[in-house]
Design a protein with these regions (language model features):
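Hydrophobic, conserved cores of late-appearing folded domains
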Residues: 190-192, 203-205, 228, 238-243, ...
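Short amphipathic alpha-helical molecular recognition features
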Residues: 146, 191, 208-215, 313, ...
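Short helix/loop capping segments that flank catalytic or ligand/cofactor-binding pockets
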Residues: 162-164, 171-174, 207-210, 295-297, ...
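Residues that form ligand- and interface-recognition hot spots within folded domains
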Residues: 158, 165-167, 201-205, 310, ...
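Phosphate-end processing signature that detects enzymes handling 5′-triphosphorylated RNA
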Residues: 1-253
Length: 656
């Protein structure tokens, strides 16, 4: 975690104050408003567990806050329920304290990390304290805010990391509570949960400001690495500069790499279908790694950054000026195919768009010497030199990157063993007019690799990349085995009648052997479309389209929107339904539905990767494999493109 000298000095002073005042609490919060989204919350929890930190679930608690910062806390579910019913503290075990700022300048905002370090003063109060007794005399009239907190604590060597799911009294735009007098004035349990992460510095007898500060920065850095999903942290200001440089190089704000289509039967049959790509007509094949698709962008200094499809920027801490202002396409792999997986850091390059100093090579054919077919009777095209191919340029780029001792390490703590390893994918080339591509595909499938692969990518040897950013490369095709052939759906949980927030829970018998009785929730599955979906309009009673009421924008461009999944070929009336049994956490009693492979809780309105098993009963055929954190994050920022699969992609996968 890089800090400016002024920031470091301010933190040191706050730590020094904290050491000299035992009643002070020094804590760090994350997010612009002290909150993070559910996806980030889960990502941090996963990182902490992967690093070996044990989570200690705590009892649910209800905190009642007054405008004067007096906090009453009730523990245990039974006591909380009793208060919610009678709105009185009488006869209930509670603790009370006053918590406020220690000094007028008691907080430091690290805006580049959306992090706030603050010193608060806590003072426990007795039940017979005059202030407490005075509050109780007018308790029904007192303005209050309620926070129901479910918390997990991680002990991290001298700091405690608290992760909390909170349902609270609503807030005004100013951030102040919308105060209430009775718990029943607002049904707090129906409010959407918020997610909070705090790092609290713990007192030690031998603390010095320097030692305690290192401990704090280490704990804060650990959380930030979970938030940024990367070991090497990046400041917000640096991210803005990188995206500006990327825009200057590519002339777009979009992800420059193309989208590809799913391989279908007509793409490999012996009898050609007019205007249909066929992998027998001069294609190469490589493996499809199970990683994060990223552009590898090298800025004018030679610093390498990875940029994912959501335009999130990841710093590598590596520099090679010989490759300045270049752009490659690849997959960032972070785990091996061992059981359980082990962490690795590999960026596997499979294409190149711009070589050093921004030289555009995207219009080159992929294979050296490959040429596009010409009409019968026309003169054969000139064969380009080997260097006028993307495969040649790709290999040259990777060779230059790893030349001699490799790139220069620019970040303290990064070592040759822990730095990002950059390598080129291995390609096997088929010849046009025969079945050699199938032998090449077999070689790819049987080759041993340290990372998990979930399919094959077929690329035409002679074609250039699409000129437009984020365009579909219609001739580039992906194939996945049946168990990995998946669709990324937007999932929306079916709600109780009359409610917009409460999920509908059904008790029923799951069809099949055994007739198991289960409580389950139902997910509705959505894909993206530019067209009006007739089934969606009829079943959901939407307005019918007409000339003055269509899905077109003011400029006549169709709106890309979620529609219920309705396959046209091989129809299944339950294709857009996914029923999942409810699981219960033995530690907290929390109930949720979860993915099968990664065992992650599934939140409403997230992107979930699902596989289809026709052998299961109707409604139970979709198997959720994992929550697509990267795509869900983009969706929550308001970006719909490249999140849920499009109607066409989902249909291709369904038909394949």
């Amino acid at each position: 975690m890089e800090l400016f000298s002024a920031e470091a000095e301010n933190i040191r002073k706050k730590v020094e104050e904290w050491i000299t005042h035992p009643d002070y609490e020094l804590e760090t919060t994350f997010g612009a408003t002290g909150e993070v989204d559910a996806v980030t919350f889960l990502a941090v929890a996963q990182r902490l567990r992967a690093k070996g930190y044990a989570s200690l679930p705590q009892e649910d608690r209800l905190t009642v806050i007054t405008p004067e910062h007096v906090r009453f806390t009730l523990g245990s579910l039974g006591v909380i329920q009793a208060y919610c019913n009678d709105d009185t503290m009488a006869g209930k075990p509670y603790t009370v304290m006053i918590k406020d700022r220690a000094t007028a300048d008691s907080q430091i905002d690290l805006e580049d990390y959306e992090t706030r370090i603050k010193v608060r003063r806590e003072r426990d109060m007795a039940h017979d304290d005059a202030t407490v007794k005075k509050i109780f005399t007018t308790w029904p009239q007192q303005r209050k805010a309620f926070r129901i907190i479910r918390r997990w604590a991680f002990d991290a060597d001298g700091v405690r990391i608290d992760m909390s799911i909170v349902r609270s009294t609503q807030k005004l735009r100013s951030g102040e509570f919308k105060w209430q007098r009775s718990f029943k004035d607002q049904d707090v349990m129906l409010n959407q949960p918020t997610y909070e992460i705090e790092v609290e510095l713990l007192h030690r007898a031998d603390d010095t400001p320097e030692i305690a500060m290192k401990r704090l920065i280490r704990g804060v850095g650990e959380v930030l690495r979970g938030i940024q999903k990367n070991t090497v942290l990046i400041r917000k200001d640096t991210r803005k500069k990188v995206l500006a440089a990327y825009r200057e190089l590519t002339k777009t704000d979009l992800f420059r790499g193309p989208a590809l289509r799913t391989l279908r039967k007509e793409n490999f049959v012996k009898e050609r279908i007019p205007k249909t790509p066929n992998i027998r007509d001069g294609y190469n094949v490589t493996d499809k790694a199970d990683g994060l698709r990223c552009m590898g962008f090298v800025d004018s200094k030679g610093d390498l950054y990875l940029i994912d499809m959501g335009m999130n920027v990841y710093r590598t801490g590596l520099r090679n000026p010989a490759l300045r202002k270049s752009l490659v396409d690849g997959e960032w792999v972070t785990k091996t195919n061992d059981t359980p997986p082990k962490p690795i850091q590999q960026f596997l390059v499979f294409d190149i768009l711009q070589a050093t100093d921004g030289r555009d090579v995207s219009r080159f054919p992929f294979e050296a010497g490959a040429t596009m077919p010409v009409e019968e009777g026309a003169a054969p095209p000139a064969v380009p030199p080997p260097e006028d191919s993307r495969h040649f340029q790709l290999k040259a780029w990777v060779s230059t990157w790893n030349k001699d001792d490799g790139p220069k390490i620019m970040v303290n703590g990064l070592t040759p063993a822990t730095k990002l390893q950059v390598a080129a994918k291995e390609f096997f080339f088929g010849k046009a007019g025969n079945d050699s591509i199938f032998r090449m595909a077999s070689r790819v499938l049987t080759a041993a690799r340290p990372y998990y692969t979930d399919g094959l990518i077929f690329t035409p040897n002679a074609m250039p990349l699409p000129e437009k950013p984020a365009a579909t490369f219609w001739e580039q095709l992906k194939w996945k085995p049946a168990h990995d052939n998946t669709v990324d759906f937007l999932v929306i949980t079916e709600k109780k009648t009359g409610s917009k927030s409460q999920d509908k829970v059904i008790a029923g018998i799951k069809p099949g052997p055994g007739g198991e009785t289960v409580n389950y929730k139902t997910l509705r599955l959505y894909v993206g479309s530019n067209d009006d979906n007739a089934r969606d309009i009829i079943l959901n009673r939407r307005e019918l389209p007409r000339r003055d009421r269509t899905a077109y924008g003011s400029r006549g461009k169709k709106e890309y929107k979620p529609v219920i999944f309705t396959p046209k070929e091989f129809p299944d009336p339950m294709a857009a339904i996914c029923r999942l049994p409810i699981q219960s956490d033995p530690d907290t009693g929390e109930e949720y539905i979860m993915t099968a492979d990664s065992e992650e809780p599934i939140q409403d309105k997230t992107i979930v990767e699902m596989a289809y098993d026709p052998a299961q009963p109707p409604g139970w055929r979709w198997k959720p494999l994992r929550v697509r954190m990267d795509k869900t994050e983009r969706l929550q920022r308001g970006t719909l493109s490249r999140t849920l699969n499009s109607e066409g992609v989902a249909e291709d996968t369904w038909n394949s």
